[in-house]
């Protein structure tokens, strides 16, 4: 086969599937304090990042071209502020013919990017760059089938 195409899953049976993905964004201590105290100009970072995760999970086939559009039955974002940044975990579940790890990863990355967007004015240095802001450790922690 040349080019690109979706994997044929027509012969597969729908089964329960679950995935958990996680990631982290390093932030300045002053930024973390502003998040905790609710002083971020754009609003509630935790709530908006959580909603971004849910939206990204549901929109994964529009973001990643060769993923299958599958019914999403459960999305549980967990956004936790730590002293050195924000940790995100997203659990996704469905009953389908293919897994939901890409959906979980999409949720995590969208949440982390949303955090960055919401705090970028606090993270910029005097040159307008982000030397302390780093997204790391994006991974699938769990993938279950059946």
UniProtKB/Swiss-Prot annotation:
Lineage, highest ranks first: Archaea, Thermoproteota, Thermoprotei, Desulfurococcales, Desulfurococcaceae
Pfam families registered for this protein in UniProt: MoaC (PF01967)
InterPro entries, per the entry: Mo_CF_biosynth-C_arc, MoaC, MoaC_sf, Mopterin_CF_biosynth-C_dom
Signal peptide span: none
Gene: moaC
Function: Catalyzes the conversion of (8S)-3',8-cyclo-7,8-dihydroguanosine 5'-triphosphate to cyclic pyranopterin monophosphate (cPMP).
Pathway(s) of this molecule: Cofactor biosynthesis; molybdopterin biosynthesis
Gene3D superfamilies reported for this sequence: Molybdopterin cofactor biosynthesis C (MoaC) domain (3.30.70.640)
Reactions mediated catalytically: (8S)-3',8-cyclo-7,8-dihydroguanosine 5'-triphosphate = cyclic pyranopterin phosphate + diphosphate
Family: Belongs to the MoaC family.
Keywords: Lyase, Molybdenum cofactor biosynthesis
Subunit structure: Homohexamer; trimer of dimers.
Protein name (record): Probable cyclic pyranopterin monophosphate synthase
